């Protein structure tokens, strides 16, 4: 009886992981314009991607949270000929991921945004979408366009991200 239960749990976990692998590689790129581009900093060319989408006119504002140094970012903006007033920084004062999500939700609610482009690593996109959708008040009807940034994925990162996604669904 216990063995059947454990095998069922394992089969569900494997099936879920297979679905997760499909999901992180299946986001369709949407070229509609939105109210803002949101980037959770953390490397992997996410900031550069957000800047490129801003320059291409997909949104008038770029909101970046979790950055440690605005000075380096200001240099990057100058190099890319981006108007600094189009970029809003939420500096990282040793904030947790939950704090960064709260900053983004505050930004969305304050400016009454109806659509955003979320720039995030593909392996972290399901987790971040789930967290944002749970955190944004239901009175704010917002359309989130996921824009995944692909990078070479290691199995340990995929497994960790899958478990984070599972926990975000369950909790």
UniProtKB/Swiss-Prot annotation:
**Per UniProt, what is the membrane topology?**
Single-pass membrane protein
Compartment(s) where it occurs, according to its Swiss-Prot or TrEMBL record: Membrane
What are the record keywords, sorted? Membrane, Transmembrane, Transmembrane helix
Q: Name the principal localization, coarsely classed.
A: membrane
- Transmembrane ranges, per UniProt, are 5-25
What's one GO-annotated cellular component?
membrane
Q: What protein am I looking at?
A: Uncharacterized protein RC1356
Q: Which organism is it from?
A: Rickettsia conorii (strain ATCC VR-613 / Malish 7)
């Amino acid at each position: 009886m216990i063995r059947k239960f454990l095998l069922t749990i394992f089969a569900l976990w494997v099936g879920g992981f297979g679905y997760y692998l499909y999901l992180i590689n299946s986001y369709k790129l949407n070229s509609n314009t939105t109210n803002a581009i949101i980037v959770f900093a953390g490397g992997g060319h996410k900031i550069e991607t957000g800047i490129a989408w801003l320059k291409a006119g997909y949104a008038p504002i770029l909101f970046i949270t979790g950055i440690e140094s605005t000075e380096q970012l200001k240099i990057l903006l100058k190099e890319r000929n981006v108007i600094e007033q189009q970029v809003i920084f939420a500096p990282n004062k040793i904030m947790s991921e939950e704090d960064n999500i709260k900053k983004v939700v505050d930004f969305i609610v304050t400016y009454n945004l109806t659509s955003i482009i979320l720039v995030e690593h593909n392996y972290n996109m399901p987790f971040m979408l789930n967290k944002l959708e749970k955190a944004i008040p239901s009175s704010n009807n917002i359309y989130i366009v996921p824009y995944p940034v692909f990078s070479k994925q290691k199995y340990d990162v995929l497994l960790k991200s899958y478990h984070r996604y599972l926990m975000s669904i369950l909790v």
